[in-house]
């Protein structure tokens, strides 16, 4: 079915724009549901797709894109969302295994919690592909497909470096750093990439953190992590820092946010504290090119986002599924980096893309990821 997968990928230019319109806050029962189509089992059986939640726009896109590609290629699929509940995701995976899945594609909620259920999958010769989040502490994960998450952080750090003129000795500037969910392996890579750029400037005094929440090393990243990547939690944390450490003439100059969900909450906290778009507005980073954040960029409330075109990730994973089921060699390009504590997982890495307000139309509209109408352009 390789040709079918390749052909189906051509449909995603339109699908990306359509899926962006899917609600971020659907009916509560939708997360637990599945979306299945029928195809002859002899063509490859059922492909189980386990996504973490519908509450973030990007996972809606990931699930829709991957499901569409696999169905167009003739595979039966079971797409399920777990409402960010680990036990629910485990139950969904077990049901997929019992239902005759031949491949499981898993975007895990907790990368350390799936060992037993995936061991059951391995005992039944079911191939497991970790989708964008590494599954840890088990040998029952066969492949991993993701974006270069360290590079994502590097791009955020370099953007801050360039915007503030740090390499030219400018400063001091007040920095407030955030990190992602401590149970998400990717969050470590995001932070390490950025902190490898920024920590030298913290140590030199060019970047100062009034809250004191500047990790001394990459290994301490989880101390500033926001569990579950929640916008509301990020907003509350930023409000606390602003209220506790910023008064009078003390202003925040830059906020390192690892993704758009956190950036959305941080921007709301900044607005509530009286920061308005313009010359005095802090540099604020992000990742994912979520629609609300792109609109914030247009409005001057966010400085950049690192775009991971999830259509390309879906295409790559669909290709890997097809290679597995056809008995061919599965395409990977990194067999050294992603050690899950038990094994180094063969990985395919995709490159991310920096988007700033001036390049929104070029990258996001020109590619069909959003329409101009969606963004109010």
Where do the PLM segments sit?
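A residue-level marker of the well-folded mature domains of exported/periplasmic proteins
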Residues: 1, 17-377
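Sec-dependent bacterial lipoprotein signal peptides
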Residues: 1-16
């Amino acid at each position: 079915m390789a040709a079918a997968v390749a052909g189906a990928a051509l449909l995603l230019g339109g699908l990306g724009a359509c899926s962006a319109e899917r609600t971020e806050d659907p009916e509560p029962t939708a997360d637990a549901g599945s979306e299945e189509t029928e195809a002859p089992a002899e063509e490859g059986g059922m492909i189980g797709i386990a996504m973490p939640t519908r509450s973030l726009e990007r996972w809606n896109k990931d699930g829709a894109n991957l499901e569409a590609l696999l169905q167009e290629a003739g595979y039966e699929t079971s797409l399920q969302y777990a409402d960010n509940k680990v036990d629910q995701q485990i139950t969904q995976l077990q049901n997929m295994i019992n239902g005759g899945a031949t491949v499981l594609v898993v975007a895990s909620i907790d990368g350390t919690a799936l060992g037993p259920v995936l061991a059951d999958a391995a005992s039944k010769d079911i191939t497991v592909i970790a989708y964008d989040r590494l599954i840890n502490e088990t040998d029952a994960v066969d492949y991993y497909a993701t974006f270069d998450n360290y590079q994502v952080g590097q791009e955020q750090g370099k953007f801050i470096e360039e915007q503030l003129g740090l390499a030219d000795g400018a400063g001091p500037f007040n920095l407030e750093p955030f990190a992602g969910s401590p149970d998400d392996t990717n969050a470590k890579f995001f932070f390490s990439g950025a902190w490898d750029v920024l920590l030298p400037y913290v140590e030199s005094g060019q970047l100062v953190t009034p809250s004191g929440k500047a990790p001394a090393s990459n290994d301490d990243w989880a101390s500033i992590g926001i569990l579950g990547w929640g916008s509301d939690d990020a907003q509350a944390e930023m409000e606390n820092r602003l209220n506790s450490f910023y008064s009078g003439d003390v202003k925040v100059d830059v906020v390192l946010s690892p993704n758009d969900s956190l950036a959305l909450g941080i921007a709301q906290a900044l607005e509530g504290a009286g920061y308005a778009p313009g010359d005095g507005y802090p540099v604020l980073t992000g990742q994912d090119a979520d629609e609300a954040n792109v609109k914030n960029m247009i409005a001057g409330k966010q400085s950049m986002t690192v775009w991971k075109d999830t259509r390309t990730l879906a295409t790559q994973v669909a290709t890997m599924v097809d290679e597995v089921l056809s008995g061919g060699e599965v395409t990977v390009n990194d067999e050294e980096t992603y050690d899950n504590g038990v094994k180094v997982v063969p990985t395919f890495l995709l490159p991310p893309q920096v988007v700033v307000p001036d390049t929104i139309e070029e990258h996001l509209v020109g590619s069909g990821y959003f329409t101009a109408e969606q963004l109010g352009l």
